[in-house]
């Protein structure tokens, strides 16, 4: 078997695939870049993972695609989950993501389009924040992750 030191070295070198739960410390904030896939289960798991990171917890969430006729309710349930599990601010953008913001109640802030969201980010995000960016790949939230990385 492997020694504890060998296991620790291996884990330290681990890199996620693509934009799946990649943690990036920018010097301004900690970005959890998870722009590859989104569904209620993976969104809840990503929200749960924030608990291990210290700082104000912010989620920037987009549409979960291919959810069928229950899509509004499924999106709303993610917002409710975020608010109930210590997320301080839930920022959303997307036609269905507005239901996430509704579910988050007073913690929710919805932006109707990408330009308005990107313009608001410097005011919404603060030094030391832990920022989860998560949406289905088709929502192209990698652009938002790149902007978060540039904040200072």
Residue ranges and their predicted role:
Residues 1-152:
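ATP-dependent carboxylate-amine ligase
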